[in-house]
Amino acid sequence: GDLVEFGNTAKVLGDPDHPYTRSLISAVPRSDVKLDRFPLVSYIEEAHEMEPLDVKNHWLGQSQDHRDYTGSLLTVENVNLRFTTKDSLFESRREYVQASNNVSFEVFEGETFGLVGESGSGKSTIARVIAGLYQPNSGKVTFEGIDLTSLKSEKERRPLRRQMQMVFQNPYTSMNPRMKIFDIIAEPIRFHKLTRNENETRQIVHDLLDHVGLGKMAGVKYPHEFSGGQRQRISIARALATRPRLLICDEPTSALDVSVQAQILNLLKDLQDELNLTMLFISHDLPVIRQMCDRIGVMQMGTLLEVSPTEQLFTAPQHEYSKQLISLMPEFKGMSQEGLKLA
């Protein structure tokens, strides 16, 4: 509740006096260079790292029954999806919006593939198609060589659904407010029958809570008792509970301030390194995308315009729309004696 600093905008952002202000500014994602980790903001209660686990000998690190498939882990091929905006008995009178237009890309095991674009570009729609929440009008989604769009029964889909989990933009709306955190995380474990007994489930949930930096005592609380950043940690713990191979992160930090965002993004980086996770990372925030992704796809109005390695996209974009996006990106170069540098 204390006002630690105030003054001219250029002075406060370019040459701050208070350590907290400096720390807060350092947490803003860099757009000019890629860093291994995001600087954390000190002076706040949530600024801590996750508890380390020996994942090689831990349940989280145990491999699932993977098929012998050497191609890309995920392939999206010519996916089209349209939504009806005006229905009618007559086809000629129906109106549609094209949410996805012949979208195709591959995601390789262990990489982070980013989808970026303005609001309404169709990037979240593609994520939901991959997760099986939407059925495309045409095209297919292949996971380890299996066409997910051809699977009709729940019995066929369940083993593959376990290997793909989503982290949503708003963690609070993805949780049952009447359930305790322990049961929220344990729910997918019980649903997929991944443990032999409840004692084993309890140990796994406690380990997951420790691993995302909350501690096992968080399990006895309800979602409303946590901050936005803490709830996102809970969402990540729940997503990890099935030991997925693919983590779909749909704007996971867009509702968080930069201090908490840095913690969550570092957590995702650590989890990917330790568990060899493959990630599909969706965001409209170009600096965040640059820091997180190995390759990036640019979407506009349901169409995938370009797929490039991260550094190539930011230094030599190919499509005119990509060039426009990069040119409009605010470039905050941080603290200097000359003051704020915004391009």
Where are the regions that the model predicts?
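Short catalytic/signature loops enriched in Gly
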Residues: 9-75, 86-91, 310-343
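Helix-to-loop junction immediately C-terminal to a conserved catalytic motif
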Residues: 131
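Conserved ABC transporter NBD signature motif
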Residues: 139-147, 160
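Conserved ABC ATPase "signature" region
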Residues: 147, 199-217, 326-327
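Conserved catalytic motifs of ABC-family nucleotide-binding domains
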Residues: 243
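A short, surface-exposed alpha-helical micro-motif characterized by mixed small hydrophobic
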Residues: 289-291
